[in-house]
């Protein structure tokens, strides 16, 4: 367990005032590196076993990879990624990790948190901070972020429809789209988010957060004004 806590500290996860208990709870925003941290720990520590309630890694020859969720392994320190997808959490896990902003259920009180994203650009984290929850970016380069009215711009890249109104509209026009839950865990170079409401009026903060954090290079938003500053 010391190796895990040392890795969290060295990767700038911040200790909270919650007393250490089992399971050790780690929360991080999208792109903060929690899954990468697990990936880096596994080859060096054969006493660790990692599973995920999200998308498992491809198996490799070493056996050091994040597996699909089954149950904790005996005689191992067991880590569970994306635990917040499970309601309720079951099993005797030693460490559980998640971005709780991507799931609607109640999360556990964390022992470590990280609100700095290495994938999302500063403009994106400012936008998410304004609309959902405070976070920052370690990047210096900006992505392209562009807003226009619902019918005033093209649908570029992967389209994410935030609500039933826009989903029905896109379906009627034969346009392919994802709902926020289908986009969970995925990344795309270019994303267009479509909303029937101004983003500041969207009540589904989980869906909004997922939608605004899927792009790598370009984010386009098609929604009624006013459009948030970023």
UniProtKB/Swiss-Prot annotation:
Cellular component aspect of the GO annotation: host cell cytoplasm
Pfam families: Viral_helicase1
Keyword list, A-Z: Host cytoplasm, Host-virus interaction, Inhibition of host innate immune response by virus, RNA-binding, Suppressor of RNA silencing, Transport, Viral immunoevasion, Viral movement protein
Transmembrane regions: none
Gene Ontology biological process terms from the UniProt entry: symbiont-mediated suppression of host innate immune response; transport of virus in host, cell to cell
Keyword Cell division included in the entry's annotation: no
Keyword RNA-binding part of the UniProt annotation: yes
Localization, UniProt: Host cytoplasm
Principal location: host cell
Every (+)RNA virus helicase ATP-binding domain range: 1-114
Family from the record: Belongs to the Tymovirales TGBp1 protein family.
Miscellaneous: TGBp1, TGBp2 and TGBp3 seem to act together for cell-to-cell propagation. TGBp1 is the main movement protein that physically cross the plasmodesma with the viral genome. TGBp2 and TGBp3 would facilitate TGBp1 function.
Its job: Transports viral genome to neighboring plant cells directly through plasmosdesmata, without any budding. The movement protein allows efficient cell to cell propagation, by bypassing the host cell wall barrier. Increases plasmodesma size exclusion limit. Acts as a suppressor of RNA-mediated gene silencing, also known as post-transcriptional gene silencing (PTGS), a mechanism of plant viral defense that limits the accumulation of viral RNAs.
Official protein name in the record: Movement and silencing protein TGBp1
Organism (species): Plantago asiatica mosaic potexvirus (P1AMV)
Organismal lineage: Viruses, Riboviria, Orthornavirae, Kitrinoviricota, Alsuviricetes
């Amino acid at each position: 367990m010391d190796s895990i806590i040392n890795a969290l500290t060295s990767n700038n996860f911040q200790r909270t005032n919650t007393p250490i208990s089992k399971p050790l709870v780690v929360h991080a925003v999208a792109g903060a590196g929690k899954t990468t941290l697990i990936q880096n720990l596994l080859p060096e520590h054969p006493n660790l076993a990692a599973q995920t309630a999200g998308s498992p890694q491809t198996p490799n020859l070493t056996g050091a990879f994040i597996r699909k969720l089954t149950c904790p392994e005996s005689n191992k320190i067991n880590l569970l990624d994306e635990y917040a997808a499970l309601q309720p959490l079951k099993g005797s896990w030693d460490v559980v990790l998640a971005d709780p902003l991507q799931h609607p259920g109640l999360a556990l009180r964390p022992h470590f948190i990280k609100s700095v994203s290495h994938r999302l650009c500063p403009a994106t984290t400012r936008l998410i901070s304004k609309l959902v929850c405070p976070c920052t970016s370690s990047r210096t380069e900006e992505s392209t972020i562009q807003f226009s009215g619902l019918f005033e711009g093209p649908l570029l890249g992967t389209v994410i429809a935030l609500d039933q109104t826009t989903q029905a509209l896109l379906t009627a026009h034969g346009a392919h789209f994802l709902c926020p839950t289908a986009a969970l865990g995925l990344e795309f170079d270019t994303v267009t988010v479509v909303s029937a409401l101004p983003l500041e009026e969207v009540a589904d903060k989980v869906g909004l957060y997922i939608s605004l954090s899927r792009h790598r290079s370009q984010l386009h938003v098609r929604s009624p004004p006013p459009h948030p500053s970023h």
